[in-house]
A protein has these predicted regions:
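Walker B catalytic motif
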Residues: 2-3
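Helix N-cap at the start of a conserved alpha-helix in ABC-type nucleotide-binding domains
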Residues: 9-11
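Helical segment within the ABC ATPase nucleotide-binding domain
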Residues: 13-26
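Conserved H-loop
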Residues: 27-33
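A short, surface-exposed alpha-helical micro-motif characterized by mixed small hydrophobic
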Residues: 40-42
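ABC ATPase "signature
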Residues: 58-59
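C-terminal boundary and immediately downstream tail of ABC-type ATPase nucleotide-binding domains
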Residues: 65-92, 108-110
Length: 169
């Protein structure tokens, strides 16, 4: 329980390395309780998110990050400041396409301009996944959706409620 919470980053890395080795060499399942998302990202293959003493999310770590629900987004503490005009599209890049040039290919293929609002790549255990928010003109949304579906990218249109809550920040 909270095995790494009071440790410096180097000691935390050493502890996580030891736990990985124990898991790999001895085949022992390790249950790690932590509030540190970097620890979860660095070692977990599966995770459970508790909220109010109840399981609110569970599954393999990559799926939890590629399909985050409101509880997961809240836990991650990622506030998105989003433009109020245009259409904001949140993209999730699975490991198979995390390093592909999907966005530049899309801009060239569709011959459109759009804004990249924010983005990042994250290492989750042995996988790398990406997330990105783009803002496009309403007239281009259907073409963008078709392109990103065909590219193997998971996406969601950001709701008006999310924009209003972020615009008030």
């Amino acid at each position: 329980d909270e095995a790494t919470s009071a440790l410096d980053p180097n000691t935390t890395a050493q502890i996580l390395s030891l736990l990985r080795r124990i898991n790999r060499e001895l085949g022992i399942t390790i249950v790690l309780v932590t509030h540190e998302m970097e620890v979860v990202k660095g070692i977990a293959q599966r995770a459970i998110l508790l909220k109010g003493g109840r399981v609110s999310n569970s599954g393999d770590i990559v799926s939890l990050f590629l399909h985050p629900d409101e509880n997961m987004k809240e836990f991650l503490g990622e506030e998105e400041v989003l433009p109020a005009s245009g259409v904001n599209i949140r993209l999730f890049f699975p490991p198979a396409v995390a390093f592909d040039s999907v966005i530049t290919h899309m801009a060239r293929a569709l011959e459109i301009n759009f804004n990249i609002v924010w983005g990042k790549l994250e290492r989750l255990d042995k996988n790398v996944v990406g997330s990105l928010v783009i803002n496009v003109e309403p007239a281009h949304v259907a073409r963008v959706e078709e392109f990103i579906k065909n590219a193997g990218v998971i996406y969601e249109i950001v709701s008006e409620d999310e924009i209003k809550s972020c615009a008030a920040i």
